[in-house]
Amino acid sequence: MKILRITVNGLPLFKQELDLLFYTQQRVSEDDKEKLYKIEPNYYLHTACAFIGINASGKTSVLKVINLALNILRNEPINHVESRNILGGCENASFKICFFDNKRNICCLETVVKSKKAKAGGYVYSIVEEKLWEKPVSSVKSKKYLTDFSGLRPIAARNTDEAYLPDDVSFIIAHNKKTNDRIDVFSLLSYTNINVLPFTDDIPLEVITFLDPTIEKLCFEKIEDKALIHLKFKGEEELILNNAVELEQYLSSGTIKGIITFSMVKEVLASGGYLLIDELENHFNKEIVVTLMRFFMDSSLNKSGSTLIFTTHYSELLDEYDRNDAIYIVRNRNGITAENLSYILKRNDIKKSDAYQSGFLEGTTPAYEAYMRLKKNLAASLK
């Protein structure tokens, strides 16, 4: 199962409809094909999607929407999904998720979610309406109509027959079972500011030495109910630790995050799934970040069409892209918006980082007035 498009309406933090496309909009050259994933002749998916914006622009919120949409599609109860808080106190939030299934059909799931105040505080969410459309990809005449279902009747709608279903679980579960289809989602949203290495049976030595060449050994051992960590640096005695938190005394935050991330990358590339990372550059140097992006963009390595979806502050990362349509500019001006760079910047040959830093794209650099106020405040405090 591959995601083609996510369109969301009715979210409190968003200024307007959020419309995210994961297939190519611009013309695909022969060179481009090496970095894309082909689902059909002339139809290609991005393997690395970037969301960039200044601080507090709403990048994390966009990633939460994507995470929630993917989890709806994989039959997860909405009230158990960590990113459900993006729904807030929504009255009727509508998710339209277009995807390509393993029967070579283009499908569109529309799920309407409402909130209800919980007695203990917060909100409880339920699905109040659902419809599913389907059409064979062979019936699509051009890319323009790939996710267009106008004029088609839904093949299924949520009704009382789904009484056995929890009211926060999508009825797409029936379609997934019928087609024996699934979607694997790996999220590092919760690891943005927390770096604790979880217990794992296998940390590839190649990952460890890539991140820190001074480490000779790092592995977990489970004895009864107790987990021990064996850590050895070259030329030093082996250390045995009782708690993963203790690793922070010996390893950098970048090494810990790197082990978590690259171990997950291995699973994602094997499954053809989705990896969501907030602030990709956090704790990493540029070379490590670029390496991670290139793993997904390398069709000889990424044979299953796995997708990296990430946020960043760093415009230099945009220059890794030959295309503009895999990049979204996120802004928050009385509400969050995400705009595809190909709609703003028509030419691919313009250096993307320069366009971003220059302010040409609007809303991509801190406001000059805010900068001057901060400078004056700092100057006054130093008198």
Predicted regions, residues:
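C-terminal lobe/lid and adjacent interdomain/linker elements of RecA-like ASCE P-loop ATPase modules
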Residues: 1-2, 293-383
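Pre-Walker A-like glycine/lysine-rich segment at the N-terminus of P-loop NTPase domains
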Residues: 2-67
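Hydrophobic positions in the central parallel beta-sheet of the AAA+
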Residues: 6, 275-277
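Extended helical coiled-coil dimerization/tether regions that scaffold
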Residues: 9, 184-250, 369-383
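Glycine-centered tight beta-turn/hairpin loop motif at sheet-sheet or coil-to-beta transitions
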Residues: 13, 100-106, 234-236
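Conserved P-loop NTP-binding catalytic core
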Residues: 44-50, 54, 64-114
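Conserved ABC ATPase signature
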Residues: 48-55, 227-266, 277-287
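Electropositive, glycine-dotted interaction segments
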Residues: 113-224
